[in-house]
């Protein structure tokens, strides 16, 4: 019914029902019931043919105005129709599908005045775009190469204009000083401005493009002037900076990378001196600790061992290389064990201090969760009722004897259920107000159990708001019942 109501000729449904556009649905329904009783074919014997069109129009008006969405659409169309001098649609195609429906809505909502304004605004924007294109000069152009015969070649490419660094400033060219421009500021080559040829280079997108190119050139310079060998030589296997390894110069970095794995004989590995002030690391070969460990495992018993140092954040002092004296090894082992124990003691002391602070925080939070302390201070909230709210019946659309009788019987049952529901929730609302007054008198800054208080407050507030919503629904049901009674009395002349 909603489709036919909006695709026929425009009819003011407010005028048909005798209501205002600001009237509520209760007032509109009162007028509808009066008119239905007056123009019903059964109440007009002998005049059925005259009354039937008016009765159908009243029914259609009520179907549109009772639905909030349909009523909003009708109000919008009513405003559009009021603004036209003729008041009718000028474009009415055949109703052959959904496409025609869309075109009808679009064509009917655009007047001649609005179309003229749109055209003037579009022309003004085009003129501004043309002016802005003429003032923009860039350092990138789309070159189109031509052959000797004058025909354009197929290979059109986007090429960068070769200019010196002195003529480029912030990604733009100066027309007066650039070599590709003449004295009058025009280009010396057959170039096409990309701003006028493609919309991709308009506005801030083109500036971002130049900025990306500039940043990429800076990154390329950093890669060329900062070799990766310097970074790898200054870090150990765990990514921690090793102070015993010095960074080589850029000139010698390439040679060190090429000769890294050349000297891998046992003699070169065994007789490498430790990193001490007497033996600086400049004279060492560039061998990683992993390679030293792999070669040291294959050494013979007659040759001295090379101690392997685990990578740490702080480099340890070098240990003496001796196998004949077991006492020196035992002293080194005990010293390392003492260092490890001291480190563990420091960590345990720090952890105990942290645990003490954590325990103090947990004790302060435990006071809030103690049920006995909370029960002594906070008032007890009332329990929320579990009774369900009744739903009022809908008013009948057709005023027949059976529909009116069933509506009145169902409303009587609803009234009984509402009476018991309202009594229970009224008592709960009274107890809830007492609970709130007690909470208002508390010193909430020094009161434990605030989380429980917030939960109780949310639960009670939601229950009271739901009761008020059902109360408003009950009030609307009473208004509909009163309007139905008035329409029935008016139909019988009482």
Curated annotation (Swiss-Prot):
Keywords: Chaperone, Cytoplasm, Cytoskeleton, Microtubule, Nucleus
Subcellular location: Cytoplasm, Cytoskeleton; Nucleus
Molecular function terms from GO: Hsp70 protein binding; unfolded protein binding
Gene Ontology, cellular component aspect: cell division site; cytoplasm; cytoplasmic microtubule plus-end; equatorial microtubule organizing center; interphase microtubule organizing center; mitotic spindle pole body; nucleus; spindle pole body
Main location: cytoplasm
Compositional bias annotation for Low complexity: 243-256, 321-331
PROSITE patterns per record: DNAJ_1 (PS00636), DNAJ_2 (PS50076)
Residues of the signal peptide: none
Gene Ontology annotations of biological process type: chaperone cofactor-dependent protein refolding; cytoplasmic microtubule organization; equatorial microtubule organizing center disassembly; interphase microtubule organizing center assembly; protein refolding
Pfam family, one: DnaJ
Domain J: 12-78
Region span, Disordered: 229-354
Bias kind Polar residues: ranges: 229-242, 270-287, 332-354
Protein function: Has a role in the proper organization of the interphase microtubule cytoskeleton. Required for equatorial microtubule organizing center (eMTOC) disassembly into satellites, contributing to the dynamic redistribution of MTOC components for organization of interphase microtubules.
Subunit architecture: Interacts iwth ssa1.
Name of the protein this chain belongs to: DnaJ-related protein rsp1
The gene coding this protein: rsp1
């Amino acid at each position: 019914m909603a489709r036919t109501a909006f695709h026929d000729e425009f009819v003011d449904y407010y005028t048909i029902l005798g209501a205002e556009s600001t009237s509520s649905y209760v007032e509109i329904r009162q007028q509808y019931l009066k008119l239905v009783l007056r123009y019903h074919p059964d109440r007009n014997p002998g005049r059925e043919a005259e009354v039937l069109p008016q009765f159908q129009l009243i029914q259609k008006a009520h179907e549109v105005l009772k639905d909030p969405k349909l009523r909003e659409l009708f109000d919008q169309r009513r405003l559009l129709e009021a603004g036209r001098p003729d008041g009718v649609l000028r474009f009415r195609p055949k109703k052959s599908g959904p496409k025609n429906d869309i075109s009808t809505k679009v064509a009917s909502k655009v007047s001649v005045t609005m179309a003229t304004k749109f055209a003037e605004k579009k022309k003004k924007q085009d003129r501004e775009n043309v002016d802005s294109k003429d003032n923009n000069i860039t350092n990138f152009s789309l070159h189109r190469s031509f052959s000797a015969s004058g025909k354009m070649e197929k290979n059109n490419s986007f090429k960068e204009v070769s200019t010196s660094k002195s003529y480029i400033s912030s990604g733009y060219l100066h027309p007066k000083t650039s070599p590709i421009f003449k004295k009058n500021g025009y280009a010396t080559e057959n170039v096409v401005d990309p701003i006028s040829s493609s919309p991709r280079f308009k506005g801030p997108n083109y500036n971002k493009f130049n900025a990306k190119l500039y940043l990429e050139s800076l990154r390329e310079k950093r890669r060329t002037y900062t070799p990766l060998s310097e970074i790898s030589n200054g870090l150990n296997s765990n990514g921690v900076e090793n102070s015993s390894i010095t960074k080589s110069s850029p000139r010698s970095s390439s040679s060190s990378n090429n000769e890294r794995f050349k000297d891998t004989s046992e003699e070169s590995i065994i007789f490498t001196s430790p990193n001490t002030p007497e033996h600086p690391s400049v004279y060492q070969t560039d061998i990683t600790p992993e390679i030293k460990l792999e070669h040291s495992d294959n050494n013979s018993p007659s040759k001295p061992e090379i101690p392997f140092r685990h990578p740490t954040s702080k480099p340890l002092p070098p240990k003496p290389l001796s196998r004949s004296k077991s006492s020196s090894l035992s002293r080194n082992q005990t010293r390392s064990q003492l260092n490890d124990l001291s480190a563990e003691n420091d960590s345990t002391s720090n952890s105990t201090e942290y645990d003490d602070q954590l325990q103090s925080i947990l004790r302060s939070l435990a006071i809030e969760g103690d049920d006995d302390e909370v029960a002594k201070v906070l008032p007890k909230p009332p329990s929320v009722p579990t009774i369900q709210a009744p739903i009022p019946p809908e008013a009948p659309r057709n005023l027949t004897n059976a529909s009116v009788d069933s509506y009145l019987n169902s409303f009587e049952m609803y009234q009984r259920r509402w009476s018991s529901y309202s009594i229970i929730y009224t008592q709960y609302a009274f107890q809830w107000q007492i609970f709130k007054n007690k909470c208002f008198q508390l010193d909430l800054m020094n009161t434990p159990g605030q989380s429980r208080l917030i939960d109780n407050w949310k639960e009670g507030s939601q229950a009271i708001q739901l009761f008020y919503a059902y109360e408003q629904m009950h009030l609307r049901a009473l208004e509909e019942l009163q309007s139905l009674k008035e329409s029935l009395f008016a139909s019988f002349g009482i």
